[in-house]
Amino acid sequence: MQDSLYVALSAQMALERRLDTIADNVANANTVGFRATGVKFEDMVSGTGQKSVSFASSGKTYLSGAHGSLSETGNPFDFAIQGDAWFAIDTPAGTVMTRDGRFSMNENGELMSIEGHPVLDAGGAPIQLDPRNGPPKAGADGSLRQNDQLVGSIGLYNFDPGENFVRYGNSGIVPARTPEPVTDRSDVGIAQGFVEESNVNPVLEMTRLIMVQRAFENTAALMRQTASSSDEAIKTLGSKS
């Protein structure tokens, strides 16, 4: 009987974590470059044979690899990645990966992220433009030109976010391992004048929310029923003694 209570409790803890991720996804449905979080659950078995009991794990988080849709802005400092890669920005937390390409040029000619951090090239150095020559023209390969002169290139990187990754700012991800620059850009490109929208599907997330809430309610009912049965058993044993 206690096993049922423990199983229900473990399921409830797992559902709470799923609720947290759904709430975060829904809150960022309109965040440029945001990648949704998912949770994978696994059964953990305690005991052996007929006495074995399966418990729900707390879950492992993962980052959705689905691409968000591209929206045209016409802003020459807006960039969207086409393919599997990330921009790199230099922050107080170290190098951060992001798909948010809303950049700008400061008075010193540095290409900056929406949050005011330097955007890095493929070598990991801040991108330096000439502030006197206006917005650059970007090639699909990320090359940047001013007055028809090559002045730099936007770095594109790949990395494994792993489990329990750390978010930074609006849509940044702090990599657990050093990201690798993309050297073969045949399947990866940059679109100037576009941004990538959040890849969160609000309708799908709300459907998941309803399902999780129902499962949570069913689990709570099971816990109440188990506790009630336990109380009845104790009373019965007490009356017999």
From Swiss-Prot:
GO biological process: bacterial-type flagellum-dependent swarming motility
Keywords: Bacterial flagellum
Transmembrane helix is among the record's keywords: no
GO CC terms of this entry: bacterial-type flagellum basal body, rod
InterPro entries registered for this protein in UniProt: Flag_bb_rod_N, Flagellar_basal_body_rod_CS, Flagellar_FlgE/F/G, Flg_bb/hook_C_dom, FlgE/F/G-like, FlgF, LlgE_F_G-like_D1
Pfam families: Flg_bb_rod, Flg_bbr_C, LlgE_F_G_D1
Name of the protein in question: Flagellar basal-body rod protein FlgF
Originating species: Mesorhizobium japonicum (strain LMG 29417 / CECT 9101 / MAFF 303099) (Mesorhizobium loti (strain MAFF 303099))
Gene that encodes the chain: flgF
